[in-house]
């Protein structure tokens, strides 16, 4: 059952404060609205209240059905295209040139732009960001020749660019947001029915699930929130896979950070996890390289794979692999966030890689691409491993994506080093070892060895995704150690309403530990509850 209610500004006699925003909130304000999905739970024995409870799974299935988009956009190039043309630097505009090149070479977005679908229905093409991007992509991919240079449209750049160095990731998020708003405006002009999605949401949008579990009664509450990009802490990670795994580790809420349990009626020790629930078609991974305090850059090497399996990091990692292929890498070359130079490497529709450095477009190979100090990584989901956007044979893709294969391969190599026998063909183990070393593999695709896949009764693969702009955190804020202020009832399933659009790109603490917001809605085992009722359960 889907419940849609509207709460007044004040409920339960309390004027509830607003929490800081997450950096993708503005984008999702009109996309999702405020929703809560749950069913009326019978009074359950505390011992039976767990993530594996059948009643809870029924509701989660409903949540998945409601949150999953039904977009029709292809994930691969409908017709192979060569690289786009170079872009003119109009004065400290390398950051926006790099971001625009990555968007231009995003397969599902480029195919939608080349279809001219938006401009055919747009009633206000003057000043429309979506029309401007459509014209930009069409000119770059279809009507240019080798060596051509374009000047980005002022419609795309003027609202953001002030002829000074800016953050490419911020411009990327700003551009996606304005394109989304343009799509919604077109729909409003032709149909008064509320529209809650757009091609931008369908391509880039995903959802993550937060879970808080009382360690005393085992009662569990779930919160769902949208994300547009996935920032990764790389301060101690050697690879993107390790950073994904590290951010999904369970966090204990103890002492002042303890969680108020609605069943125990007091603050109790709890565990908290945050991981991907609905995977996006296009995955943006942002490596947190810049200090929020000084702007200084963490210029360390972090490896990343050409092919990434996201399945181990899902909230429910079942079924086969969920493969993604790298198609763009945005790079910052410099010492601080307000200096240096931006460029990118992109994979064209015909499968070849190119370095896009303002006006210069040069051929490069995947080896050099994987050696860059990446800032933003762009992956597209692969539903068909034989698509042109993947250069590797299907069998090799399965090998690269399967962590179990990588572990077995490593063990075989160790055994061969200790063996001096020959096989039936007379080939010595030493020769076989040399031959094996020539095989291309993605070492960073391995699951970290220290990970216990079945620890404390929790499923493996939990990824903590904090959609937050790293350059706008409040000083001293620690996302993994925020004070618990929210009293979630047991077995609650909450879908957060996006916050105010006023602070795009501001800090994003873990929302399940923040006060309730006007408009958030919830249905629990005790029935429908308002934010005021939640806060009056004895936790204040």
From Swiss-Prot:
Residues at the catalytic site: 94 (nucleophile), 341 (proton acceptor)
Disordered as annotated region, ranges: 1-22, 431-461, 499-540
Keywords: Apoptosis, Cell cycle, Endoplasmic reticulum, Hydrolase, Nucleus, Protease, Thiol protease, Ubl conjugation pathway
Domain USP: 85-382
Primary location class: nucleus
Record field: compositional bias (Basic and acidic residues): 431-441, 508-520
GO CC aspect terms: endoplasmic reticulum membrane; nucleus
Protein name, per record: Ubiquitin carboxyl-terminal hydrolase 17-like protein E
Source organism per UniProt: Mus musculus
